[in-house]
Amino acid sequence: MYDQVLEFLPRIPNEVRRLKNVIESSEIPNVDIGPHCSDPYDCDFKGTCWKHIPDYSVFNISRLNKDKKFDLYNQGVITLDDIDLSQTDLNPNQLLQVQSEVNGTTHIDIEEIRNFTNGLIYPLYFLDFETIGPAVPKYNGSRPYQQLVFQYSLHIQETLTSVIEHREYLADPSQDPRIGFIEQLIEDCGTSGDILVYNIGFERGKLNDLIEVFPEYSKELSGIVNRLKDLMIPFQQKWYYTPEMRGSYSIKYVLPALVPELSYNDLPIKEGGTASNTFLSMVNGSFAGDVEETRNQLLEYCKLDTFAMVKILEKLLHV
């Protein structure tokens, strides 16, 4: 890296002059979109240069290499309707996405979905975490920007036909949130039954972080880690796919596609970033709103995350 910097240094004066000329010009540079638009970061002018690209295009094809997307674009292929399926090297899941959009069809692999649901062990737990990532570490054993748990929501179903219970935790912002989080989570999760999460890497990673810092809880937390199951798998594998999912298996796309009556739009806190920033402002002492009301809003948001998982599983159970 050092040698690369030394090699680039003599070019800086010319680059500065070139950039100044661009800034001072009255005309927008005539440069087509390309991989450079997001290399190394998304350009602030994407909203201008990408105006001719529709909201849903070849750039939304799931897991398609960026260069291949631009190969299609450079051939004049922009929408999914433009793709010649006989001349493409898309993989089966990508083809499924394109065909679903073009034909307006839903794909359901009943056998795979039933294998997944029949393998679930009751009682079932539906779990979701919220985290903060302080730039300056505030607690022992933490790193700059490390994601630290401060809240969870947990829906519990003892049997396939039993009433759903709900439990939750939201830390006191004046204290290290992790010990209280750990102790209540261990109590609420019991010792048996599958724990469903959506995108297993996140919750598993946070639990492993806790095990590293608090080894005295390693046995109980490791038991929870071993019981995790990923509700995202049926959608990631395209066992259940609708055009509304637009190639994504994010819960933000899956939920409105499967359970349109459930929505975050009416909540004061609508997404995880807002929840994180809100709690972090409480931790930093800069929060100026109604603390009790906002804590209730945080609980309401996180509760919907796990209730959404309950409703998604219901859909899978009825295919």
State what each model feature region is.
Residues 109-191:
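Conserved RNase H-like, two-metal-ion catalytic cores of nucleic-acid enzymes
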Residues 80, 92, 132-136, 161-162, ...:
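Flexible loop/turn segments at secondary-structure boundaries
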Residues 1-58, 66, 75, 246, ...:
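Acidic, Mg2+-coordinating catalytic module of metal-dependent nucleases/exonucleases
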Residues 59-124:
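N-terminal accessory regions of nucleic-acid-interacting proteins
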Residues 52-53, 70-72, 81-82, 134-137:
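Short helix/loop capping segments that flank catalytic or ligand/cofactor-binding pockets
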Residues 1-16, 22, 166-276:
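Conserved DEDDh/DEDDy metal-dependent 3′-5′ exonuclease domain
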Residues 43, 127-129, 197-200:
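Short His-Asn-centered micro-motif
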Residues 22, 75, 86, 101, ...:
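Generic, well-ordered alpha-helical scaffold segments in large soluble proteins
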